Design a protein with these regions (language model features):
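Non-catalytic nucleic-acid substrate-recognition regions in nucleic-acid-modifying enzymes
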Residues: 2-247, 496-498
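S-adenosylmethionine
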Residues: 340, 350-451
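Conserved S-adenosyl-L-methionine
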Residues: 288-375, 379, 388
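SAM-dependent Rossmann-like transferase core, predominantly class I methyltransferases
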Residues: 264-301
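Short, charged/polar, Gly/Pro-enriched secondary-structure boundary elements
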Residues: 64-72, 273-276, 465-467
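Class I S-adenosyl-L-methionine
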Residues: 278-279, 422-499
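Hydrophobic residues embedded in beta-strands of well-ordered beta-sheets
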Residues: 57, 263-264
Length: 499
């Protein structure tokens, strides 16, 4: 697993040094567990050195080369880093913390970062027209507004003085249902009045330039302030220095403030939306991120002339990403659900209309009875059902077993390989052991998908030929007609497949 963000040495990043004005430091966010794959792509396509942290890859690149970064297929977001501090000591006094965050806005190299942002988004005006000195005073704290979304489970509630906690946080041990309607209405009314006062103060300040907002991500248990409070102080200083208008919803510029214990860095977001949404027009319930799809295909190391199949393709995100990158490889996908096949065709047609030429095709089939010849496929890349939104773990035990056998039948012996993603580790490991004569487990990677801990398994096909009459014995054998049978004998009632 990649090291944490606090292990990074800012001196190793040239883009953060004042003497390198033509080089900038970019933060490329990646799926946790696939940072090394993203770094390999950066080194291969950009020729840059990478510094890996958990969920991130930092690179130094020439300012003129920044547009090339958006062509990478393994990253989700791109941010330009302006300042990074490893020992940002926060005092115990809240007001001193606010003062520190307020003055910290003077430290970043705003001109370099905003120059990169302007070129990426083709902003017509000069973002920084005048820089005003700060008044050396932090903004008025508004804990009743900034902390109203803090949950009772937050780890820093005990660090905040009880006198300034909002009403819903003071009643830490009282169930939320026990609050009276009058109490709830008073909280809403007070918040509304203060929000109107806050907005009237903003209207009195004449602002020009890009509309911006501050997004603060804070990690740690030793802080005595919330993320919104830190964003208010830092954003107030930015507004005071440059006179940019604040807009939390229809913003043009998003400034990122990351706080991890005493590790703090500031960045500017260079992506309007995550890059994993760029190739899909028809989304399903379980669409896999296109960046994960690319990484899985890359792990399979396809060679020109090979055939890649996804027997449970869903919206065809894996075949699409593979065909866009590996154009000399044939990509096939299929699913048992008719609506999924329709979504697949819609997504493919959308890319074809954009002028993309892709060696890809999709069909409706059963993953346990594929209409393909023996040993006609080189690689299997598939996102198996997790058993969460679709199916169940009980179904997975049977589906995984039958699918692994069918995959073994259609893949080439000795050279075939499979890259399979699943959240149901127990079912997968149990079935890999049952088909160990056909599949050899090479390695696995644990990744984070929306808070779920999933695993990518890389399997290699053994040299053993697939026998249609082969029966893999299980430890506990039950007849298929018995209730509770979880391991029916494969191919027992199935006619032999012709080659």
């Amino acid at each position: 697993m990649a090291p944490g963000i606090t292990s990074i040495d800012p001196s190793s990043l040239k883009g953060l040094l004042a003497e390198h004005q033509d080089i900038c430091t970019l933060e490329l966010t990646a799926v946790t567990g696939l940072e090394e794959v993203a770094a390999e792509e950066c080194q291969e396509k950009l020729g840059v050195n990478c510094v890996i942290a958990r969920g991130r890859v930092f690179i130094d690149i020439h300012v003129q080369q920044v547009p090339e970064v958006f062509k990478l297929r393994s990253i989700d977001n791109v941010n330009v880093i302006l300042q990074m501090v490893t020992n940002f000591s926060f005092p115990d006094n809240r007001e001193q913390c606010f003062q520190q965050l307020y003055k910290f806005a003077e430290k970043p190299d705003w001109r370099k970062g905003m120059s990169v942002w302007k070129n990426v988004f083709s902003f017509s005006e000069e973002p920084i027209q005048e820089v005003k000195a700060l008044n050396n005073d932090y903004c008025k704290p508004r804990p009743d507004i900034d902390l109203k979304r803090m949950k009772l489970t937050s780890q820093i509630i005990d660090n905040i003085p009880e006198g300034i906690l909002p009403q819903h946080l003071k009643k830490k041990w009282q169930p939320e249902e026990e609050q009276t309607n009058a109490e709830i209405n008073s909280i809403v009314t007070d918040t509304t009045v203060e929000s109107e006062e806050d907005s009237s103060e903003k209207q009195r300040v004449q602002a020009s330039g890009p509309k911006f907002r501050i997004s603060c991500n804070r990690t740690g248990t030793n802080h005595n302030f919330g993320s919104s409070e830190a964003a208010r102080q830092f954003g107030g200083a930015v507004n005071e220095m440059f006179g940019w208008p604040v807009d939390l919803s229809c913003f043009e510029l998003e400034i990122l403030l990351y706080i991890d214990t005493e590790f703090v860095y500031v960045g500017v977001c260079l992506t309007r939306e995550p890059l994993f949404k760029r190739n899909l027009t028809n989304f399903g319930r379980t669409n896999l991120r296109s960046t994960i799809c690319y990484n899985m295909v890359r792990l399979a190391a396809p060679q020109p002339g090979e055939v890649i199949v996804d027997p449970l393709c869903g919206g065809a995100t894996i075949p699409m990403e593979g065909s866009l990158t590996y154009s000399k490889v044939l990509h096939l996908g299929g699913d048992n659900f008719g609506q999924a096949v329709k979504r697949s065709r819609d997504n493919i047609d959308y890319l074809v209309k954009k002028g993309k030429s892709m060696p890809i095709d999709v069909a409706q089939w059963d993953a346990a009875r594929l209409p393909l010849r023996n040993q006609c496929v080189d690689i299997i890349v598939s996102d198996l059902p997790f058993g969460k939104r679709i199916g169940s773990k009980g179904d997975n035990r049977v589906l995984y077993y039958n699918s692994l056998l069918e995959m073994a039948r259609i893949t080439r012996t000795g050279t075939g390989r499979a890259v399979l993603l699943t959240h149901d580790r127990n079912s997968m490991m149990r079935n890999i052991k049952r088909v160990h004569t056909l599949w050899k487990s090479a390695t696995s990677r644990t990744i984070n998908i929306g808070g779920l801990s999933a695993v990518i398994y890389i399997l290699h096909r053994t040299a053993l030929l697939f026998d249609p009459n082969l029966k893999i014995a299980s430890k506990t054998h039950k007849k298929p007609s018995e209730p509770g049978t979880m391991w029916p004998e494969y191919l027992a009632a199935r006619p032999p497949l012709s080659t």
